[in-house]
From Swiss-Prot:
Catalytic reaction(s) noted: 2 Na(+)(out) + phosphate(out) = 2 Na(+)(in) + phosphate(in)
Annotated positions of the Phosphoserine modification: S265, S269
Family: Belongs to the inorganic phosphate transporter (PiT) (TC 2.A.20) family.
Gene Ontology terms: cellular component: plasma membrane
One Pfam family per UniProt: PHO4
Record region (Disordered): 268-288
Start and end residues of each stretch annotated as A: 550-558
Compartments, as annotated in UniProt: Cell membrane
Chief location: membrane
Protein name, per record: Sodium-dependent phosphate transporter 1
Length: 679
């Protein structure tokens, strides 16, 4: 009993003088919340930026998921405050007799880190919250105790991580995406290989992320008592179990879903429909031709119509912005959608009978081009077929307009012409064809004629003419009208010449279905781990401040209070909702276009890099890993798809993060020491 009384008295005596610093504790809580806000506005983009960029989730959905997993992760995993940040960079034992100076240093470090992260968020530059707090900690220590208080060897490791993190993560992401593209994306039918690889992908995702979470040794979950072999065994066991579940239950369901999506509604068929076999196409063609003959007998067409001599197999078009997929040789034929009740004449001057009775006749020049190259596909399109709505949806997915909510993006205007929009969204010039109207024995005839090279006159065309124009590759991307590019938001991309190349290698609908949930799962795991890791950056100095005030001991080993972690988690979530979209736009849209397959490669390889680097002992930055992966995968898809000027700005922001946050922290610490505390 006497010993207990003695220890209690000693603790009270130690903390007694610190009561005068209550104002500093309150100020520290306020600044810590601002710091957590800035972490949410900047660092959370690491977890869901690529998912939003690929269109897998909207910004609102990302904020909801991130709020849940960041908060849970901060409470469950954040109890193990990073020793590198709190004690590894400076010698805290030097502040045994000057606890007030250490408290002032904690406030200064939080202020310097928060200010620079807010500035970076305003500039839409993703930076490392870890390196911010590192620079700020070094800054106040230099003012308080000089160079003797800094462990420069730890700083050298951090400088190395600037280059190791993006390089290592970029290499891993590049290798993974190369394998995915070679064995899945570039296959004529990517579904079989994709379904075979699905259990492996899920197993790797679950195994790597579970190991990362358990390896942190969270006390609340009891992971700190697990040996390394136990962590590995549990991770591998869960991964194998997940693979079996996916193989026996998820894959069959996914296969049925893909088949159902392929047999899509008529409104989607102009873009996404894919027939199962040529035999089915032939049967449907026969049926459609018989219907046409019953409804529009050849004799009724008139002298201008040549009897139906050949029927071309049906093939609908799946195209990308500014890009046409290479069709197999057997499909490089003029084709029409006979389901739309259209007949085709196989004579030299081919003519197509429209459902409304109109006859569209191709001129000699167009027919010669078709016959010589076999590259142009012509389809009938009705204005009520839903194409306009489908194209609008496709554009929004490609530009991430519905996910970003960027008010600066100007929506395309229809301009009273259905197909001006059709052609603009396909990335085609508006003057590729001219429409000439005339009368031919009581029948309306439209002629498609080859344009003169110097003709730039805009004309209004009906849906059929413009859709033919859209799917025909008549001009190179460099000849696209600048106004169309401006409306599509492509004309401003200084970092990539030939901006249409940024849309290359877009995932097919069935491939997107395979990778969508994988990317969401990986992002949720990443957000959970991020909440536990980065809450240390926001709350670590506050924990030190609070424990010094509460116990009077600068090297206190008291467990971190849960309510402090929850406080930081709430601040992170508010920062994400209020200002998170700015950096998310940079990570998911501006740096390079993201697809579900590339986004999954980025997420998984980044998580693997963090696990490896953590075992090595590097204070690795998740931000640097994600940016390195995004740039690496974007460069593999197309060198011109990466905005290298933006990447240069991001790298420069990394380079100045430690000095700027350190200078701000040092300035505040100087005010505390020489003006306020006079110590």
């Amino acid at each position: 009993m006497a010993a207990l009384i003695t220890s209690t008295t000693a603790a009270t005596a130690a903390s007694g003088p610190l009561v005068d610093y209550l104002w500093m504790l309150i100020l520290g809580f306020i600044i810590a919340f601002v710091l957590a806000f800035s972490v949410g506005a900047n660092d959370v983009a690491n977890s869901f930026g690529t998912a939003v960029g690929s269109g897998v989730v909207t910004l609102k959905q990302a904020c909801i998921l991130a709020s849940i997993f960041e908060t849970v992760g901060s409470v469950l995993l954040g109890a193990k405050v990073s020793e590198t940040i709190r004690k590894g960079l400076i010698d805290v034992e030097m502040y045994n007799s000057t606890q007030g100076l250490l408290m002032a240093g904690s406030v200064s470090a939080m202020f310097g880190s928060a200010v620079w992260q807010l500035v970076a968020s305003f500039l839409k530059l993703p930076i490392s919250g870890t390196h911010c707090i590192v620079g700020a900690t070094i800054g106040f220590s230099l003012v308080a105790k000089g160079q003797e208080g800094v462990k420069w060897s730890e700083l050298i490791k951090i400088v190395m991580s600037w280059f190791v993190s993006p390089l290592l993560s970029g290499i891993m992401s590049g290798i993974l995406f190369f394998l995915v593209r070679a064995f899945i994306l570039h296959k004529a039918d990517p579904v079989p290989n994709g379904l075979r690889a699905l259990p492996v992908f899920y197993a790797c995702t679950v195994g790597i992320n579970l190991f990362s979470i358990m390896y942190t040794g969270a006390p609340l979950l009891g992971f700190d008592k697990l040996p390394l072999w136990g962590t590995i065994l549990i991770s591998v066991g869960c991964a194998v179990f997940c693979a079996l579940i996916v193989w026996f239950f998820v894959c069959p369901r996914m296969k049925r879903k893909i088949e159902r999506e392929i047999k899509c509604s008529p409104s989607e068929s102009p873009l996404m429909e894919k027939k199962n076999s040529l035999k089915e196409d032939h049967e449907e063609t026969k049926l459609s031709v018989s219907d046409i003959e019953n409804r529009n007998p050849v004799s009724e067409v008139g002298p201008a119509t040549v009897p139906l001599q050949a029927v071309v197999e049906e093939r609908t078009v799946s195209f990308k912005l500014g890009d046409l997929e290479e069709a197999p040789e057997r499909e490089r034929l003029p084709s029409v959608d006979l389901k739309e009740e259209t007949s085709i004449d196989s004579t030299v001057n081919g003519a197509v009978q429209l459902p409304n009775g109109n006859l569209v006749q191709f001129s000699q020049a167009v027919s010669n081009q078709i016959n010589s190259s076999g590259h142009y596909q012509y389809h009938t399109v009705h204005k009520d077929s839903g194409l306009y709505k489908e194209l609008l949806h496709k554009l929004h997915l490609a530009k991430v307009g519905d996910c970003m909510g960027d008010s600066g993006d100007k929506p395309l205007r229809r301009n009273n012409s259905y197909t001006s929009y059709t052609m603009a969204i396909c990335g085609m010039p508006l003057d590729s064809f001219r429409a000439k109207e005339g009368e031919q024995k009581g029948e309306e005839v439209e002629k498609l004629t080859w344009p003169n090279a110097d003709s730039k006159k805009r004309i209004r065309m009906d849906s059929y003419t413009s859709y033919c124009n859209a799917v025909s590759d008549l001009h190179s991307a460099s000849e696209i009208d600048m106004s169309v590019k401006a409306e599509m938001g492509l004309g401003d991309r200084k970092g990539s010449n030939g901006s249409l190349e940024e849309w290359y290698d877009q995932d097919k609908p069935e491939v997107s279905l395979l990778f969508q949930f994988l990317q969401i799962l990986t992002a949720c795991f990443g957000s959970f781990a991020h909440g536990g890791n980065d809450v240390s950056n926001a709350i670590g100095p506050l924990v030190a401040l609070y424990l010094v005030y509460d116990t009077g001991d600068v090297s206190s080993k008291v467990a971190t209070p849960i309510w402090l972690l929850l406080y930081g988690g709430v601040g992170i979530c508010i920062g994400l909702w209020v200002w998170g979209r700015r950096v998310i736009q940079t990570m998911g849209k501006d740096l390079t276009p993201i697809t579900p397959s590339s986004g999954f490669s980025i997420e998984l390889a980044s998580a693997l890099t963090v696990v490896i680097a953590s075992n090595i002992g590097l204070p690795i930055s998740t931000t640097h890993c994600k940016v390195g992966s995004v740039v690496s995968v974007g460069w593999l898809r197309s060198k011109k798809a990466v905005d290298w000027r933006l990447f240069r700005n991001i790298f420069m922001a990394w380079f100045v993060t430690v000095p700027i946050s350190g200078v701000i922290s040092a300035a505040i610490m100087a005010i505390f020491r020489y003006v306020i505390l006079r110590m």
